[in-house]
Amino acid sequence: RSLTGKLVRVTELDVALGTSSPSAEQLATQANVYQMIFESYKANVPESQQSGITIWTLSDNAAEHEYWLSGDAPNLFDANYERKHAYKGVCDGIAGKDISADFSGDDWKNAYETEGEETPAE
């Protein structure tokens, strides 16, 4: 824990795999590492000093990795902008639990529906 009282921010986070074609096991490990980082941040940095965690870039698309980790798959979305296991790892880390059992999307949908209107995703 920081005794200085200064804000603590993790910036430009990514979890490199060393390949642009990771195996299912590598993807699961990547998700676990992302989850561990978020859980560790929440557990070890006092809430009053938590200033956030930013991810280096959005996806594994080659256009986003021209100068950094070219030929790797370090991010939350794959090259086609589909969520990877890492996305769930981050969500679970933020929530502090496995959210898949609790999340159907209905809560979000119901929060945005009003009578006679469609949800933004429809």
Language-model regions: role of each:
Residues 1-122:
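Aromatic-rich peripheral "rim/lid" segments of glycoside hydrolase catalytic domains that contact
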